[in-house]
């Protein structure tokens, strides 16, 4: 069903599971790390903790109904997740992937991966910048037939150790930078 007043509702859920909430200016960090997000009035959940340090653990946990203290991948595998509930509520769901995978969370919903697109504007050697997700989001919204839609965008974000490959020169704002995947060769100032 369409949202309030017959208009479709579009919710974009950005999964940046490698992002540190304490390094978001949206959450009070001293450096202006999220200027574009601040302009959009987004909701940042800064008081949230992951179930684990790996994508395989953290992503399924985010979409599980289990509390963090009771979460296990074995228990979650046999339960509905948030996306399943949305589909049962007659909401269209699309998963846009620019990370290693959805780790089973999107198994029962339509999903697209950036590496399938192989868009030369954003992709090099099989890795794509998160910017490509914006193009895919625009396509998904325009193709949607006036139905409520939830789009999950799973970013590569700040996955390391090749942090310097996660953004273009246009976004290089904080110097000095660590331009190698050999982090031991970089100073603390370059890394943070």
Please tell me what each predicted stretch does.
Residues 182-192:
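Active-site-proximal segments of metal-dependent phosphoesterases and phosphodiesterases across multiple
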Residues 1-13, 18-182:
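Active-site-proximal alpha/beta segments of enzymes that process anionic O-linked groups
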């Amino acid at each position: 069903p369409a949202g309030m007043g017959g208009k479709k509702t579009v919710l974009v859920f950005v999964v940046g599971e490698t992002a540190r909430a304490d390094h978001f200016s949206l959450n009070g960090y001293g450096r202006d790390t999220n200027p574009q997000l601040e302009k959009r009035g987004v909701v940042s959940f800064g008081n949230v903790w992951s179930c684990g340090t790996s994508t395989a653990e953290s992503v399924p946990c985010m979409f599980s109904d289990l509390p963090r203290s009771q979460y296990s991948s074995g228990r979650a595998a046999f339960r509905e997740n948030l996306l399943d509930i949305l589909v049962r509520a007659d909401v269209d769901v699309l998963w846009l992937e620019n990370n290693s995978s959805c780790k089973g969370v999107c198994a029962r919903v339509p999903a697209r991966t950036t590496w399938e697109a192989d868009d030369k504007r954003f992709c090099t050697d099989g890795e794509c910048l998160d910017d490509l997700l914006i193009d895919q989001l625009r396509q998904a919204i325009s193709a949607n037939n006036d139905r409520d839609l939830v789009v999950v965008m799973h970013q590569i974000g700040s996955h390391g150790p090749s942090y310097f490959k996660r953004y273009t020169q246009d976004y290089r704002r904080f110097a000095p930078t660590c331009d190698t995947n050999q982090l031991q060769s970089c100073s603390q100032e370059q890394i943070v």
